[in-house]
């Protein structure tokens, strides 16, 4: 190369707000809720609670995290602390990127054949009414389980002004407590969600 030559690389990027590892802002299922750019940064840095339901999910791919799962965790580790981010470890990350296993089907657009774990309606209500959390997360495509058609968990969590993180990778590397999550969503003005880089800080 001559002194006047240089290397230059550039690309074009586009994506859904709700594809890959991403955040669901309250407005996604709550009219008038916060958009992704309005979520305070302080809410995106949080101590985590990791509820391991992978054994149950291996037996039932439509398993939903229950109130019993939450109270069993609390018997071992104490009450879920205020300001926590509650993460459901289903073990589903091991199936990525095989859509047939991860989603239950590799047929594009056919929501009638989706099968993967999620949060139960009762657990979502418990977390919103009985605990003071800032959000939930899961290593599947949705906080609602695959066969859901009404997305009631979304309605409860986001309707309470909380946020959700979906398609989280490597949850199997986090302990039940003591980790801090730093969620870094793309700051899309007016966005209902955004691709998100998630960093875990361990003690």
Task: Give the residues covered by each predicted segment.
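Active-/binding-site microenvironments in catalytic and ligand-binding cores
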Residues: 1-203
